Each structure stands twice: as structure tokens, then as C-alpha cells.
């Protein structure tokens, strides 16, 4: 089951690359639902109204191609955790860097940001706080 809140449209479709669009069903209070199972990594998005533009999932946990592109389904339960003994890092005395993924690199992706983490370590950063990754009005989502 996948849901999206789109209160001001008369029609919502779920779009996945290489597959036919799936008409979503109005579920009340602006919510739309589709009884579709997505596997970890499946790309998808929504088409609102009579348009044809793909919109990312505003509740997505993964945007591999940037905030304006298709979302990718993330199944946290399928991940095999191997670090149960890790206790985290001490916050006291740490240096926190507030990172906005959309502007930290030209690509605006987490993968591109990770490639620059060594620089943050070199300047003394001990913790990274991701700024909100959900969409806001404007070009850069702020």
C-alpha cells in the first residue's frame, strides 16, 4: 500500500519506470492510496491531476537523483544491520555541520555529499546534521 496526500486534485496516478501508471483511489481528507507493493530500490513518483509531470513522494526516504526527480522505495526492514554494539559518538565537544543536500554539491544528492565528507573531517567536523530533505517552495527547497 502506498499513499500520498494531495487534497486539491481530482486524480492521482502512481508512476513507475517501465510500467503502466496505476490510478490511485481517494481515501478521504485529501489522501490517495494504491494497493501496490514496492521492493527496495524501486523508483516511483506521482502524477497529479491531468498533467504528465512526475512528482517525487514528499515522504520519501530516498531521492537518488535529487529532490525534483523520482523517489526510490527504501525498505529498512530488508537491511542487515551489523553494528549492534556501536554506541554512537559523544556530542560534548563535538563540531556539528548542518548540511543541506540540495546545495552542498552541484548534484544535490547524498552520494555526491558523501564524496566530500573527508573535507569536513579535515576541518574538524565530528557530526553532520542533515537539514530537512522534504520539499518546500522555491528552486532549492527553502
Could you describe each region identified by the protein language model?
Residues 5-12, 19, 39:
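Short proline/glycine-enriched turn/loop motifs at strand-loop junctions of beta-rich domains
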Residues 120-142:
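Aromatic-lined carbohydrate-binding/catalytic grooves of carbohydrate-active enzymes
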